[in-house]
Design a protein with these regions (language model features):
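ASCE P-loop NTPase helicase motor core
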Residues: 1-43, 48
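Short, conserved catalytic or adaptor-binding loops enriched in Gly and charged residues
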Residues: 10-28, 84-106, 208-210, 238-243
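ATPase catalytic-site recognition across NTP-hydrolyzing enzymes
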Residues: 36-125
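Short, hydrophobic/amphipathic alpha-helical patches that form generic packing surfaces
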Residues: 67, 265, 298-307
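A short acidic Gly-Thr/Ser loop motif
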Residues: 126-131
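Short beta-strand scaffold segments in enzyme catalytic cores
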Residues: 132-138
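Mg2+-dependent endonuclease catalytic cores in nucleic-acid-processing enzymes, primarily RNase H-like
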Residues: 144-286, 311-312, 328-330
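Acidic two-metal-ion nuclease catalytic site recognized across multiple nuclease folds
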Residues: 305-330
Length: 330
């Protein structure tokens, strides 16, 4: 018994030694837990998993049930995209954040972004729909670099008012330059009703942002049709560093983590010689899970890039390549 008593005293000393250090670590750390449906295997039973395997395709089964998903498709629409080269992790001004008392309410806003300039205008790509998304960037080094610094999204029934609210909460109080250049879908292949809806959505977002004091210039209205091969080729040029007329692109992997994930999962599809961005994931994945798993956020990025830089390499994009005939408009 004496041996047990002494061992308890020894263990208590070890605990008292480490408790302050562990408490300090907890205040500056995040607990990450990853779990799958197999945690409840005893309750759900084998029949549940058999039914799900028969009902879902393999990608959905691995993602939804097993918490396993593809990290990258083989044939990417963003062919030259390299996360080591085109993503950055030094997102925040940590000196400012660490001075705060994190026990009090803390809201991460643009003022804590290392690469945000409150005096520069914001470039915004917008993909409307039941899943609506914004991708926000700023040009650096006199236009030689484009940094994508933030993503926003919402799902139906939330629409433009919710996107504008999120945008204002993040940028509103910190921005001196209130100018936004908004690049929505060019909608080359849309029916007239769809085109009118996109125009309506874009103008509604413009109105909501302006209600918060931003000055919004709406681009892309009435411009020429954009084809899949043109977008694909522009992305090849931009992410491949093949043109001095185009900026280097860097994406914040902390504030745009869904965009970074979804770019790697955006497949190129060829049908009878036609090249397309395969958007089938937008129909397969539930709305609430689409941010990092579908082509929604990458589409918003494409609208921004083509709207902003397509005219800079017009000669490269004005003639259809011989090996990509009869491509579809989007």
């Amino acid at each position: 018994l004496e041996h047990i008593r002494l061992e308890i005293i020894r263990q208590d000393r070890i605990i008292s030694l480490w408790q302050p250090r562990l408490a300090d670590m907890r205040r500056n750390a995040t607990l990450y837990v990853r779990a799958s449906s197999f945690c409840n295997k005893d309750i759900l039973g084998p029949k549940f998993f058999k039914t799900q395997l028969e009902t879902l395709d393999m990608d959905e089964f691995l993602t939804s049930i097993c918490a396993i998903r593809h990290k990258e498709v083989i044939n990417k629409f963003f062919a030259n995209y390299n996360k080591e080269k085109h993503q950055y992790a030094d997102s925040y001004i940590y000196e400012s954040i660490l001075r705060l008392d994190l026990r009090e309410h803390f809201l991460l806003t643009a003022r804590y972004l290392k690469h945000y300039n409150k005096r520069d205008e914001l470039l915004v790509g917008y993909d409307p729909g039941h899943f609506s998304s914004l991708v926000v960037g700023q040009e650096k080094e006199y236009g030689r670099q484009l940094r994508i610094i933030k993503e926003f999204y919402c799902c139906y029934p939330d629409e433009q008012p919710e996107l504008a609210r999120q945008f204002y909460e993040f940028f509103g109080a910190d921005s001196l330059n209130k100018r936004i250049i908004l690049y929505p879908d060019r909608a080359g292949n849309k029916r007239r009703e769809e085109l009118e809806q996109i125009t309506t959505d874009s103008r509604a977002l413009k109105r909501e942002l302006e209600s918060y004091g931003f000055e919004v210039e709406l681009m892309n209205e009435g411009q020429a049709t954009v084809y899949h091969w043109q977008q694909f080729k522009l992305l090849l040029l931009m992410f491949g560093g093949r043109s001095n007329a185009l900026p280097e692109i860097l994406i914040d992997e902390n504030e745009c983590r869904n965009l970074c994930s979804a770019i790697m999962l955006s497949p190129l599809k060829k049908t009878e010689g036609r090249i397309e961005l395969d958007k089938s994931s937008e129909k397969k994945v539930p709305l609430k899970n689409q941010a990092g798993l579908t082509t929604q956020l990458p589409s918003a990025l494409i609208y921004l890039l083509f709207g902003r830089y397509g005219n800079k390499v017009l000669s490269e994009l004005s003639s259809m390549p011989d090996n990509l005939p009869d491509n579809l408009a989007i």
